[in-house]
Amino acid sequence: MLPLLAALLAAACPLPPVRGGAADAPGLLGVPSNASVNASSADEPIAPRLLASAAPGPPERPGPEEAAAAAAPCNISVQRQMLSSLLVRWGRPRGFQCDLLLFSTNAHGRAFFAAAFHRVGPPLLIEHLGLAAGGAQQDLRLCVGCGWVRGRRTGRLRPAAAPSAAAATAGAPTALPAYPAAEPPGPLWLQGEPLHFCCLDFSLEELQGEPGWRLNRKPIESTLVACFMTLVIVVWSVAALIWPVPIIAGFLPNGMEQRRTTASTTAATPAAVPAGTTAAAAAAAAAAAAAAVTSGVATK
């Protein structure tokens, strides 16, 4: 830092030469800004070398994949599976590692529901979705940010540490590396991974008509099970009404069998004359005999 300051001061305020000029005292005005400060000896000419911290490098240009992902339209689809679950899909061209954010937007600046998912891939099932009380309309915003980096550091690498002053004093030749050494990967939140977010605004009421929501769709399995259970209930109901009839009829007297039993008994035994009928016939015979006797006495 000191040689650089001396060079700037010398350029701003040039000093007059003393006893032969600056050629006799090469170290008076300092070294150029693009020269190395680690010379091996005073007689050796100073060779210009590249310093990692002398000038910042050119800004990094995004790769073609990242540029395509940034310019690509949102390819996000949301389907409602159950009452409180969503199935989210997005295109793979957006990246490998994706972060997903879901939050409500109709609460006047306060998110009634918010969820975050880190390093996920499609498809993603979001369960236990927070629903507004009273069946009110709920607007949500879904943001997906994806990056093309998988566990490597994308930020600018730091230069290596400067050599010690003892090595420079001893005159040992030291050379700075042409490229700075890579540092070991740090935590994920220090890696500086670029993400390209794409957001989608939707409402839960708009998803009710989609074929992915099973509450509005009746699968063939449910229909068949419902028909079978209805048939079973009808059969059991009819059987419950019919099965007591033959059992109760077995305990009741049968009219046809009673008539057959009476006819056979009458044919086997002689007919009996009733007592009243016999007395009337005897009275009639006695009256006839008395009348005959009376008529015979009158003729004599």
From Swiss-Prot:
Q: What induces it?
A: Up-regulated during Ras-induced senescence.
Instruction: From the Swiss-Prot or TrEMBL record, state where the protein is found.
Output: Membrane
Query: Which N-terminal residues, if any, form the signal peptide?
Result: 1-20
- Glycan attachment points: 75
**Transmembrane ranges?**
231-251, 273-293
What are the record keywords, sorted? Glycoprotein, Membrane, Signal, Transmembrane, Transmembrane helix
InterPro entries according to UniProt: TMEM158
Molecular function as annotated in GO: peptide binding
Modification after translation, per record: N-glycosylated.
One term under GO cellular component: membrane
Which cysteine pairs make disulfide bonds?
none
Q: What topology does it adopt in the membrane?
A: Multi-pass membrane protein
Which superkingdom heads the taxonomic lineage of this protein's source? Eukaryota
- Family annotation (PANTHER family): TRANSMEMBRANE PROTEIN 158
What does the protein in this record do? Receptor for brain injury-derived neurotrophic peptide (BINP), a synthetic 13-mer peptide.
Family, according to the entry, reads as follows: Belongs to the TMEM158 family.
Q: In its UniProt entry, what is this protein called?
A: Transmembrane protein 158
Gene, per the UniProt record? TMEM158
